């Protein structure tokens, strides 16, 4: 279930800090920087931060922004704190379905090799979206190149 992230603010910070210097952080940031969300007590217009919870247990984090003038959702962030938990994917795709059905455009990025790629591909295909691949545009800590992938779904 998605709930306002401010309710789990400290716990989300600690979970992100546990992931510093990991491949998961590369998937979140798209670069080698370490990062954690700055969750505001009162979010700005168009900014959404959610804790993904099962029962009362924090299992993930989802964020995005909406430009209401352009009717577009973008700048998504997703982190699963409990790898393999199907509730994370279920809640995220439910929110994506809501956004796709109400907005003109939904776009998000992903680093190649992310385990969510297959699910993103299927979702994008189901909504007649596009997948753009920028070959070898990201370099990881081991020196290996990865693709930068952009998904877009545009409603008429």
List PLM regions with ranges.
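Conserved catalytic-core motifs of GNAT/GCN5-like acyltransferases
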Residues: 126-146
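Conserved beta-strand-loop-alpha-helix junction that forms the acyl-donor binding cleft
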Residues: 107-125, 138
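Residues on conserved beta-strands of the protein kinase catalytic domain
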Residues: 72-74, 147-148
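Conserved acetyl-CoA-binding loop-helix of GNAT-fold acetyltransferases
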Residues: 84-101, 117-122
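Short beta-strand-to-coil "C-cap" segments at the C-terminal boundary of structured domains/repeats
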Residues: 152-156
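A short, well-structured alpha-helix characteristic of acyl/acetyltransferase catalytic modules
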Residues: 1-41
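Acetyl-CoA-dependent GNAT
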Residues: 28-73, 79-85
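Short hydrophobic/aromatic beta-strand or adjacent loop that forms the aromatic wall/cage
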Residues: 47, 146-150
């Amino acid at each position: 279930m998605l709930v306002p992230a401010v309710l789990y603010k400290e716990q989300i910070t600690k979970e992100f800090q546990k992931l510093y210097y990991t491949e998961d952080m590369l998937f979140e940031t798209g670069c080698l920087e370490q990062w954690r969300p700055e969750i505001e007590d009162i979010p700005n217009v168009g900014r959404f931060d959610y804790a993904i919870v099962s029962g009362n247990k924090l299992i993930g984090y989802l964020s995005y922004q909406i430009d209401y003038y352009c009717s577009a959702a973008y700048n998504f962030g997703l982190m699963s704190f409990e790898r393999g938990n199907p509730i994370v994917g279920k809640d995220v795709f439910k929110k994506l379905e809501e956004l796709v059905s109400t907005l003109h455009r939904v776009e998000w990025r992903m680093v190649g090799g992310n385990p969510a790629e297959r699910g993103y591909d299927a979702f994008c295909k189901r909504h007649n979206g596009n997948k753009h691949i920028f070959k070898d545009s990201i370099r990881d800590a081991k020196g290996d190149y990865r693709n930068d992938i952009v998904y877009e779904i545009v409603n008429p």
